[in-house]
Structure formats: structure tokens, C-alpha cells
Amino acid sequence: LPKEKYGYDWIIGNEKAFAANTRFVEQDLNRSAPGDINSSVYEVRRAAELIEYGKNFDVVIDLHGTKTDSGIVTIIPYPTEENIRLAKSAGLNRNVVWYSEKSKIAGPLAQHMPVPAIEFECGPKDTKKAFDLTYSAVRRFIEANRSGQEVCDDKNVEFYNVYGKLYGEHNPALRDFVLAEKGGESFYPFLSNEYSGIVCYKMEKTKNDKMFI
């Protein structure tokens, strides 16, 4: 889609890490916002640059990949009414609210953007399936945004809230968004077996109108 015609832009968030084929150079970019343009740490400076660049747009979508077979979902790091509305308009059925008070100091780029912002998380990364899902979702969103429409209506949308994590050895039997039970507790797994020492993040299904901050 021509950038000028559709009024959007795309950029690589962590350019140095991308060039080196690694997640980060000094620290996780998505744990570095709002950043500091005078920092000696590359990702902290880059976070500040990206936050400033975000002022040029009406909304920001931050694209991420995961090893898990989660399909494509939205993540809302900062669940304001505007960001929830943006997620509901994006055309994806599954939406994950993942907010932390600690992230006010240093956290996700989308949480600190000066305009409505969410993440698209898609997996398994580096697969044709993930590429096709991401491409289709982004294209639909850009086309709908240009015409002032929403991609889908509210009745097709599910919301989940991340409330904790399960530590331990990886469990291949767990599937994201498939109800599981551990120690008498029922929860929906997310990013199962993604990180060392963490089995998964735990979610509850919720109503989106109960989540505004």
C-alpha cells in the first residue's frame, strides 16, 4: 500500500538489533519507554526517538512476534478508553490487556505513546502463517482507517486480562487461550513456553468496559 496515499508509515523499532539478528543490543527496547534521548544505552535513546516520532500520527500499532502458536492478537499495555476502542476497531477477535504499574517508569512503547497505541502479537514467528496473518491484519486496518471505518463490530471481540505468571519447566501440553488448571486454579495461558523459567502468563476472560484506567 503506498504510504503517501494511505497516510501511514512503518519503521523498524530496534534497528541495531535487527541488523545483528538479535532481540536487543543492550536491553529490551519494549521495556525501555518512555526512554531518554541523552541515555548512554542505545535502546533507551531509541525509545525516546520512537515516542517523539509517534506524535506525527493518529494511532500507532507496534508489531511483535512470538514462538507460540497464538495466531494474531492485540495487546493493550495501557487500557485507556481510547486504546480499548482502538483494539475493538482493529478486526482481531482476541485482545489481551497487559498493564503493569511498574511499566510507568520503564515499559512498552505502546504504553507511553502520546497517541492511542496497541500491539499486534503474532506467532509462530518466522513462519508463513504468522506473516500472512500479520500482513492481512495490518492491511485491513490501514484500508479501514483511511476510509474512517472499523474492521469489525464489537460482538466478535473477546478480551482477556493478564494477572500473573506460572513459573516452572515448560509444558508442551499448554495452548494459548485454551482453559487450563494448575493447583486448583483455572486460567487461560498466554505466551506458553516462550520464556525460560516461565511456563506461561495467566489470564482471565473479562468484559472490556471494566478495564479502563
Please state what every model-predicted region is.
Residues L1-I213:
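Structured catalytic-domain cores with a bias toward divalent-metal coordination
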